[in-house]
């Protein structure tokens, strides 16, 4: 860690910018290879029949795309502009994220930053910087997955499991191995007689942070296993048709579930995951279990809340309100950040989506909104402004069991609001 801190900040930023550009090349590969309609645009893919073989120089970040312009007849004029811009964007985002999280310590409250800058607090400052670097690595990893998911969603209106399943598993693994990868929480304890401030405690956000919930050790294990299996079952292929009655619907549902080869792998994943949870709970415990449990609950609430909204909105609007990829995307984000940030993200994302939806309704364009990019943008805003967001929302998360009750009321109110939105949309389209 010392050699990193001894390196000037601008050198670190320049190195991360170049690393981000290189990473952007592989994100381009993921965008074109993981999509439903795969395309051989990335220089790391095989060239299409009739195209000249790919050269080594074609795989150089940025400059390689100028050589690949020769394939414009196959992929369309200017096809190379977006992947080149994405490499630049990835480099800029990685460097900017490091500057904000590490250079400016932007995820920490001002009071803590001032405390760490006081003479005699060098040890605490170095420990905080080590934690911040772990957080940055986790957030950079999440950013990479969100970029791939967003661009595939923009292209195809879908988010493949090939992006969100590995992303979710990596988020869970990071939370268990390095709980500091979760968003930070700083608390100040009062000194003797309530005067002055003792040394601050910099920790990570936990499942029960600020909430008065008493979860015993064994009950927390049951909760974690339940969250894992909810995710696994949610990923299974489900076909439910009631046209021929409940019995036929159930028979077809089970038959399709058993025929799908993905079901077997998800069951295996659930069993192995359960064994892993038991190991972490009984043998590692402490912060490792708290971190993993926080990620599991974040995964379940992030994905589960989106799933419920999808079901309700689809029933009211009479068409699919959002794809199931949005559900798995929010589960992945929850695994990296926890459930409290997921609620913030869930309420931030619609603002941009509603504005775009109204504009599309007025211009009679495609009424379907790619919601995934808005979820990712809201997640990025939540990460960057976390210190301010937590300062303002922490008292709300201390309400304990009033939180799920409030969410239930919001879901009940969503029905009438969606009916109003459907009426406005139909009127704008002249229906």
PLM features per residue range, with description:
Residues 1-431:
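A membrane-topology feature that recognizes alpha-helical transmembrane segments
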């Amino acid at each position: 860690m010392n050699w990193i801190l001894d390196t000037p900040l601008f050198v670190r930023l320049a190195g991360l910018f170049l690393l981000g550009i290189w990473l952007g090349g592989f994100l381009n590969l993921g965008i074109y290879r993981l999509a439903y309609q795969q395309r051989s645009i990335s220089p790391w893919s095989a060239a299409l029949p009739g195209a000249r073989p790919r050269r080594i120089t074609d795989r150089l970040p940025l400059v390689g795309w100028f050589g690949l312009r020769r394939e414009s007849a196959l992929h369309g004029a200017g096809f190379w502009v977006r992947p080149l811009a994405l490499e630049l964007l990835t480099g800029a985002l990685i460097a900017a994220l490091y500057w904000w999280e590490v250079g400016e310590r932007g995820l920490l409250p001002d009071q803590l930053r001032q405390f760490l800058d006081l003479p005699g607090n060098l040890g605490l400052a170095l420990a905080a910087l080590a934690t911040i670097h772990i957080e940055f690595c986790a957030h950079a990893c999440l950013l990479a997955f969100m970029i791939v998911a967003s661009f595939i969603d923009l292209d195809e209106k879908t988010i493949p499991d090939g992006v969100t399943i590995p992303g979710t598993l990596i988020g869970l693994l990071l939370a268990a191995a390095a709980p500091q990868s979760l968003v930070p929480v700083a608390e100040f304890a009062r000194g003797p007689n309530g005067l002055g401030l003792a040394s601050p405690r910099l920790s990570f956000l936990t499942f029960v942070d600020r909430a008065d919930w008493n979860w015993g050790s064994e009950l927390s294990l049951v909760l974690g296993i339940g969250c894992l299996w909810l995710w696994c079952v949610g990923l299974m292929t489900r076909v439910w048709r009631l046209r021929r009655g409940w019995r036929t619907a159930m028979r077809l549902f089970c038959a399709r579930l058993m025929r799908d080869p993905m079901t077997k792998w998800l069951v295996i994943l659930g069993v192995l995951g359960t064994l892993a949870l038991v190991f972490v709970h009984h043998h590692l415990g402490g912060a490792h279990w708290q971190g993993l449990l926080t990620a599991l609950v974040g995964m379940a609430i992030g994905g589960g809340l989106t799933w419920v909204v999808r079901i309700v909105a689809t029933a009211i609007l009479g068409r699919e309100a959002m794809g199931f990829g949005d559900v798995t995307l929010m589960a992945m984000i929850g695994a990296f950040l926890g459930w409290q940030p997921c609620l913030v993200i869930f309420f931030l994302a619609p603002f941009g989506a509603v504005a775009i939806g109204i504009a599309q309704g007025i211009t009679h364009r495609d009424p379907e909104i790619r919601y995934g990019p808005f979820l990712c943008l809201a997640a990025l805003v939540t990460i960057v402004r976390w210190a301010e967001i937590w300062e303002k929302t922490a008292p709300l998360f201390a309400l304990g069991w009033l939180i799920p009750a409030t969410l239930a009321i919001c879901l009940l109110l969503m029905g009438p609001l969606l009916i109003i939105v459907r009426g406005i949309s139909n009127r704008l389209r002249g229906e």
